[in-house]
Swiss-Prot record:
Signal peptide: none annotated. Residues 222-241 have a biased composition (Basic residues). This is Probable protein VP2. Residues 67-108, 183-286 are annotated as: Disordered. InterPro entries: DUF755 (IPR008474), HEV_TT_vir_Orf2/Gyrovir_Vp2_N (IPR004118). Residues 242-265 have a biased composition (Low complexity).
Amino acid sequence: MWTPPRNDQHYLNWQWYSSILSSHAAMCGCPDAVAHFNHLASVLRAPQNPPPPGPQRNLPLRRLPALPAAPEAPGDRAPWPMAGGAEGEDGGAGGDADHGGAAGGPEDADLLDAVAAAETLLEIPAKKPTPRAIESLEAYKSLTRNTTHRNSHSIPGTSDVVSLARKLFRECNNNQQLLTFFQQATRDPGGTPRCTTPAKKGSKKKAYFSPQSSSSDESPRGKTRSRRKAGRKAQRKRHRPSPSSSSSSCSNSESWESNSDSSSTKSKKSNKIKISTLPCYQGGGI
């Protein structure tokens, strides 16, 4: 359904005129906008209408002006690399080079090498090995395990971690032996541990007995002890120890024999011989 416009022609003209005044007041400070508009209309010509369409006209082409010649200095001008030397300036060998003739100069070889190097840089190298799609979980696990870094040590036990662990284990053993020694020393303050130099190769270790020895009887254990005692005596004669150690060992053996003879007559019960397990250290000091 058609409805008449809300604003009539007079109101539209008034809006257009007020917009012209507002735009003039925004850009110019003169009091008369109409006189300003008439002055511009007289100075500036109205835009011409485009020419009517007609047959296509062949307009003449304008030639570009020639550029001024550059000042030339003697000896500063270098020959064109593709012209084949100084003759290219006159058009002799230069024409042949432009039409595909071989110049044969060192500059041409350098230029060709530079072009080949630039083309090589533009090429994208292929990846080796060629990547392939992972289709299953098993393939992913196999690729991951194959690319892991293995231990680079060829001989086991030569790494820094293993050597440090061994040193720590040795120090712990030494500390444990010292702790055991001090505990036994506190329990038996009267007893003094005996330490001697290690025996030679091929010889048996000597067994040290505590001052308080027990009795023995004619049981099988007593027989084995007597055999051990005879072996110790023979071993002492072979190695010939120092007078101090021999006297102490002899006194210990005699006391052990006297105690064993006296205790055998009193009772038939056998007691174990207490062997000191104190560690032996060298170097004169703990």
